[in-house]
Every structure is written in C-alpha cells, then in structure tokens.
Amino acid sequence: MSPQGQLTRKSYLENKIIFVDGFVGGGKTLFCQLVSSLDKVEMWVHRPLVEQVSGLYAHKNIDLNTAVSLLNCCFDNEIYCQALLRDQNFRHFDHSSVFKFPKKSEYLKRVLNSNDLELFEKFINEKRVLHFMSHGITSHIEPIHKALGNRLIFCRLMRCPSSMYMLNHLARWSKRWGNESRNGMMCNDINGEMVPHFILERIDEYANANEYERAIIMLEEWIEEGNKAVENKKYQIIEVPFEMLVFNPKKYIQEVSSRLDVELSDNVLREMRRQKVPRKSLDDAPKSSIFQAYGWRQPEKHISAKDQIKDELNEMRGYLKSNMMKRVERLVENYVSRYLDFKL
C-alpha cells in the first residue's frame, strides 16, 4: 500500500532556544557558561541529534519538511525533559555538569520536586530558555531556523585560525570522528576515510589529507560557508570573536540578554569572575585539568592578542607545508580584518 501523504510534526511549545555554535577548542565553554548565567536560561547541553538532522539535510539525505519535523520533536521533547531535569549530567567534574550551572539552587529545588505537571507548567509559564552547544553547524542553520523562527537565538563563536590549541584539537578529532562510539558525528565514507558532515565543498580533498591538513580544511570550510549564513540577515546570527570576548565579555553577553529582554544580574558578574573575564591575555583562563589534557597551558607572561597571533603563525610555519600555510595566512588575514581592531 502506498503512503497517502507526507508525515509531519509541528511544534507545540514556544520557549526560546539559544545555540552557541563553534569548533572544538574555539572557546564555546566560556561563552556558554556566561550565557547560562542569564536569568531564565538553562544550563547548556550538547545534543548530537540536532547536528545530525542538520547535516542530513545539508547533504540532501532528507528534505526540509522531514528535517523540521524531526527538530520539532526534538525541541519539544527537550523542553519537557529539561523541565524535569531528565537527561542531565550530574558528573561533578564535567564542564557540562549541573554542578557547573551558575544558578545551582534553581536545579536543587527542581530535582527535589516530584510533581511532573507542576514543574512543566512552571517551565512554560516562566518562559525558560533552552541552551544548546553545537559544533560547526552555522552553515546548516536553515532547518533549525525554519523550525524555530523568532524563537531562535543563534550565536557563532569564532576564534582566529592561528590558534594552535584549536588546530591541535581539530587534528586529534579528525582521527576520531566516524571511528568510535563516543561521538555522534555523521560522516561521509570516502573509500574508508570518514569526512564529517560539516564538510560539503571539500570532501575529496579532506579524505586525502593528513590530520593537520584536515584541521585547516575544516576551518576553511566552516569559516567561509558560515560567513554566507551570517550574511543572510533573516538568521540574525550573533558573531562572537573569542579574541574580543575575553577582553570585553559584557558586550557580547548583552547582545544575547537584549534578545531575551533580561538584565545582566549579579549571577552574570559572578560567572565572569569564575571564568576570569575580562582577562590579561587570551590564554589566561581558570585552571582546568580537562583543557590541560588537550594542550592548554597557563601563560608564563601576558602578551597582546596581536603578538600571540604572530607567535602562533611563526610556530605553524615550522611544520605546515607551504601551500597549507598560505591558506592559513589568508584565513588569518581575513579574520583579523573582519573581527579585530588591529592589523598584523
């Protein structure tokens, strides 16, 4: 029997949803913590299903109606589960743990309340805001925007392509995506080489590259394709360059708060102090065993963002092939011109 029509699913809830999108090692945790400190905003979570659906649509594996219907199911279910604190991370040392939530007392009251209906109705009536961290889906924003419309607040966390910390992070993950159960990255299988879903224009080149070349290709694709989405004004994407955020955090957190129509409370100021912002230098972050495991080190001295970018480029020249180095230099030049208040 042939199907009589196309399955669809609308959204029944109206809570706003914040996305903070960026690459691994790009500074998302810092900004997500600040956003989580805003009134009505929930602790940030990572839900791979949203990235997977967006990737499937971007690669034309599913149509827009299917993508939107799946996202509507996902978002409505997430709102209900969040109201009851289901699917929350209670591991104390994880960055995404509820113990890192700037307003922990709110969650303590919620977790001790056994009345499901009361919790859900309160969540809806207070217009609580969901908060997702995502990885490299700015250029895949269309189905998310179609599903949420003016409920969506999409932030794009950028970091200069000269960042050695970010480059090393991406290189390591390029060997893991599509090859282990821990991550939910959708990939193209090109003769046994796994190409992550956010690569659309450089699939064959990525498949034939080594891990550091892949890191550069990822940055190139994410930046250039993401810029096209930013230029489409219907999405109203908030761009947050890491090099500006760490020195002037209020500017960017106020952009989000104004969309939510909330003021910056003492919770925000306290979280700024915990995150050591404003900072004396880019890497002057709070100590973290997790970040240290990925290569972060406390700076021995404080230097300007301009000098750090120059030092990182010089370090890259020591081990990148000349053709890849030229691509990095072009990306850095464009990044500095677009976001920063100095010239190299």
Where does each model-flagged region fall?
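PAPS-dependent sulfotransferases, especially Golgi type II membrane carbohydrate sulfotransferases
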Residues: M1-I18, V195-E213, E220-I223, N227-E239, ...
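Walker A (P-loop) phosphate-binding motif
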Residues: T8-L38
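Hydrophobic/aromatic beta-strand patches that form the interior of the parallel beta-sheet core
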Residues: I18, E42, I153-C155, I238-V240
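Short His-Asn-centered micro-motif
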Residues: D21-G22, H131-I137, L157-R159, P241-E243
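Short catalytic/ligand-binding loop motif for oxyanion handling, primarily in non-cytosolic enzymes
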Residues: G27-C32, V50-S54, T138-I141, S162-L167, ...
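PAPS/PAP-binding and catalytic site of the sulfotransferase fold
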Residues: G27-K40, I144-G149, H169, E239-L264, ...
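PAPS-dependent sulfation machinery
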Residues: R47-F132, D189-D204, I309
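Conserved phosphate-donor/acceptor-positioning beta-strand/loop module used by diverse small-molecule
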Residues: M133-G136, L148-L170
